[in-house]
Amino acid sequence: MSEHKDISPPKLIKDRGSLHPINHMKDSIMNLLISFGFEIVDGPEIETEEFNFDMLNIKKSHPARQMHDTFYVENKSKLLRTHTSPVQIRGMLKKKPPLAFISGGKVYRKDDDATHLPMFHQVEGIYVDENVSFAQLKDLIYKIIYSLFGEDVELRFRPSYFPFTEPSAEVDILSKEGKWLEILGCG
């Protein structure tokens, strides 16, 4: 007795799911910045020390360059990028100011605790022109935060240090539980 096989095409599935919340947030940020005139640039997840550290003024003695903080591959000749900043460097090597770039993607650090994971997503922008001020950067950040979370969100800027920006700050938003949550660094 022969077995009959159904060779008809599969039924179309109407609801195929939805965008992951991380991708939704990344797309929202990127689309907002595109509306402000930023251009999307992309770069590799496997980087060299030159682009990931050296060109960003991160000294050889900096703790972030140690094996316990960075995922090195290929006999330590390459690494999984620890931030999306190398993408900006690559963009600046290709285009002269004025320029406005954004990039988004996965980054990797040897962090694993209640508030950190070894892989996370980052969106980063750079704007280079004459007569650009920190006040303009703050205004842009307020516009982004209010667009994403509403104008009733409370935020604060805290002075910080990043080897590749001066001045630098970290930005926190106040959670519904009354705790400050760091959401970005800038400079």
Please place each PLM-identified region on the residue numbering:
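TRNA-recognition modules of translation machinery and tRNA-sensing kinases, especially anticodon-binding
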Residues: 2-187
